[in-house]
Amino acid sequence: MGVKDNIITPYFEDSTVFCDFINGAVFKGKQVLRPENIEQLPRELIMQLPWETDGRSNQKTLIRDTVKQAYFHTMYVIFICENQSEVHYGMPVRMLLYDSVQYGEQMKKRQRENKKTGDLKTSAEFLSGLHKGEKLMPVVSVVFYYGDSPWDGPLSMEEMILLPDDTAELKEYLPGYKVHLIDARNTDPDKFSGDWKVILETLRCGNCKDDLIRYVESHEKELEELSAKASRALLTMLGRDIKAEKDKEEFTMCRALEELKEEAKMEEEIHVIRKLLKNELTPAAISHWLDMDKAYIDRIVELQ
């Protein structure tokens, strides 16, 4: 797994974290899922590829980010969260494929169980391997997007399929699959409990360093109360580099604030120096007037 996967995926695997996210994303803040009623399912799915028949393996392993089975309202549901740091322009096809394989796995399991018990009665049941009226568990997939840029990709199969106006009759025959996207920019943080409210509010600042500094300064108490895992996940979502020497339990968002301020100060200094260089001041003169190390200014000149 990549660095982001090594931090964010394990964060979602925590049952309380996952329940808080799904309760906000799917149930609009109602506390429906409870940690004691969910269990982890395998992330790997085996997909048959019938078109690969030239001697290569006709199986492909799909790995989903977080897969949980939840029991509520006398039923089981499979909830899945996929994490995205970048826009994916084929997301509807990708998610439709993943969910289809998930349903296929359920069906194969039912078919094996029915074959083992030997209680299929009609020829239609024997053919399908399922009892008449047999139901599968719902599969609910949510995409959590934390990228810097607003999502500008398709969120439905309809958006991906070429359908001219004079062929509108075909629309009802095409899959109506939709991607359920959670993006901090258009999500109400108040629907989320636990650390998620603060995480989503912080992510709303996007890549605007000034907005992020203002938010962190005005929400210092809430950020300090984030768990160590939540702080590390949030910093990773923000694209902050968690260096090895800082990769400790006590590293928090508020400790990262000082780095943000230093970076903002440095960026302002570089902006001023480049402006003076453009006005044909020499590095030596700039060093004198700004009381800065000339070697630092020389490095900026080299990078121009």
Q: For each predicted feature, which ranges?
A:
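Elongated, amphipathic alpha-helical interaction scaffolds
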Residues: M1-Q304
